[in-house]
Amino acid sequence: MDFDFLTIAIGFLFTITLYQALNFFSRKSKNLPPGPSPLPLIGNLHLLGDQPHKSLAKLAKKHGPIMGLQLGQVTTIVVTSSGMAKEVLQKQDLAFSSRSIPNAIHAHDQYKYSVIWLPVASRWRGLRKALNSNMFSGNRLDANQHLRSRKVQELIAYCRKSSQTGDAIDVGRAAFRTSLNLLSNTMFSKDLTDPYSDSAKEFKDLVWNVMVEAGKPNLVDYFPLLDKVDPQGIRKRMTIHFGKILELFGGLIDERLQQKKAKGVNDDVLDVLLTTSEESPEEIDRTHIQRMCLDLFVAGTDTTSSTLEWAMSEMLKNPEKMKAAQAELAQVIGKGKAVEEADLARLPYLRCAIKETLRIHPPVPLLIPRRTEQEVEVCGYTVPKNSQVLVNVWAISRDDAIWKDPLSFKPERFLESELEMRGKDFELIPFGAGRRICPGLPLAVRMVPVMLGSLLNSFDWKLEGGIAPKDLDMEEKFGITLQKAHPLRAVATPL
């Protein structure tokens, strides 16, 4: 028995050694980017942990700014420097423009209709054009400015009501609700969630549940052979959530089509898109409008709310920075007033605070994964066909070769800096870069500073339960966005 066990153990060790040796020489012969040696079957999955952005940043310090890993069955290339990011996202943008599609997005075939996941081709270009011109163009954003102003006023009113009772405010949830209503007013001319009632709680929870499911690590993404099994049930649950949201949007679209027959015009984004679909059905149709709404509500709400929550957390963690922002606001627009978008040009410290928040806490720390359709050469290394490509913007924005004292929250570092977040300066690309840059960037750079500035100029803030600023937990939770592991709860006192 002992001899048999020893034989099996030796055979097992020999097999592992042989596998790793063959893998090592295979990697050398293909000239793949350097990386850790993979284990049989699981590859390098065991190295990711529950915060992959941090694990990958640590591995990159050993293996370099372009790194190759085997995550289950999926060859993965990780980029961890501004120079390599520029190579992938700008110089060879087209070669890296396809998406690596999570299995959860197969629910209701969303990947076949979504501008986020479609390949760069005529359909994608048409939808992207429709989105940019009808929602995120300067003229459209200017025309909708009054809607954003009204939603910020409602957020301030909600915080003021909570302050009267001394109740702590869940900042992320309040911002999430504001973002939802902003989008629903822009799209449909109506609120879909009410801060004071449970009448629309189901919709808010549906969007929240989609983000929770999308943020879970899914075995099928690493082992596509498990596709039919869906072992964690993520795609099944996502199918239910998507179905309910699509049914709601379908009802709103049908309702609007009936109104249009009666000559009713709202002049909102839905009206414009429906008119476009009637005039150019080959460019966009009803299904694409429905799926575009799904994209906007899922992607647009969480990134905005998580960024605002991180910004408020950094202000509460660093009271001297909050005082500096409040002093600027009081001097420029007057204490107690809500910030308007027209004020932002005169509020450089506030704008820098948002930049610094996005540097330290990029909403999507690894960006949305890319995929290579063909074999590509990058800086002498071979990136195989069908590789998943991750750009670790979290690591780039904390690189001490670029940033002095990178872990400290210092908005003033940007006061004399020319760096922008619009995809040209690869030291700071929280919204990505190239043709796949986040289309919602023009809205985000208006909405987030207005929300933050209004909260800071309307209230003094302190942490719930008398927690000292230095004791505020800033731990991260990795998911579809980089959220606070523990929601920020703060008490507001009107100024």
From Swiss-Prot:
Instruction: Kindly give the Pfam families that the UniProt entry links to this protein.
Output: p450
- Drop me one GO molecular function for this one: iron ion binding
Q: How does it sit in the membrane?
A: Single-pass membrane protein
- EC number(s): the record gives 1.14.14.83
GO cellular component terms, A-Z? endoplasmic reticulum membrane
BP-aspect Gene Ontology terms: monoterpenoid biosynthetic process
Domain of life assignment: Eukaryota
Q: What is its main location?
A: endoplasmic reticulum
Query: Which parts of the chain span the membrane according to its record?
Result: 5-25
The record lists the catalysed reaction(s) as: (2E)-geraniol + reduced [NADPH--hemoprotein reductase] + O2 = (6E)-8-hydroxygeraniol + oxidized [NADPH--hemoprotein reductase] + H2O + H(+)
The entry's keywords: Endoplasmic reticulum, Heme, Iron, Membrane, Metal-binding, Monooxygenase, NADP, Oxidoreductase, Transmembrane, Transmembrane helix
Which subcellular locations apply to this protein? Endoplasmic reticulum membrane
Is Heme found in the keyword set?
A: yes
Q: Which residues bind heme?
A: C438
Q: Kindly state the tissue distribution recorded for this protein.
A: Expressed in leaves, stems and roots.
As for family, the record states: Belongs to the cytochrome P450 family.
Give the protein's function: Hydroxylase involved in the biosynthesis of hydroxygeraniol, a precursor of the iridoid monoterpenoid swertiamarin.
Protein's name according to its UniProt entry: Geraniol 8-hydroxylase
Organism, as annotated: Swertia mussotii (Felwort)
